[in-house]
Amino acid sequence: MSENIILKIVILGASTVGKTSIFIRYFQKEFKTTITSVGVDFKPKFFKLEGEKIKVNYIDTAGQEKFKSISQNYLKSTDGVILVFDITNKETLDLINYWEDFINKNSKPNIGKILFGNKLDLADNREVEYEEGKNLANKLKCKYYEDRRKYRIYYE
């Protein structure tokens, strides 16, 4: 399939927020509760929109400090970012501001962003209310979604 448009989307967030679980759920249609990311994984997804063939390369990054330089390199040419936090861990929402600065310093201007509150299946342990995520998304001028790790509601 020859693509008319090729996009790159990087998934960023702190360690243990479920970035890799989202990635695996989206591409392999399975759910794993414990996955350790080491470095970077990437996979393409193909779409057709209004007659245009689109290839989107999704890049899953490890959240550990030692992998920041890898994330930094991918950001230079990325078209969009999915910022992920864990709704059961307030600190991961607070770290989104760090990631926003990281993106602003290392990517092209006006990059597309989505803020994604993960682990809605653990809502009984919720530390971040929907409104908090939505307010931060408004501040970052991006869309906000929440989802369960186990189910694929908003991924497409």
Where is each model-derived feature located?
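TRAFAC-class small GTPase G-domain
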Residues: M1-E156
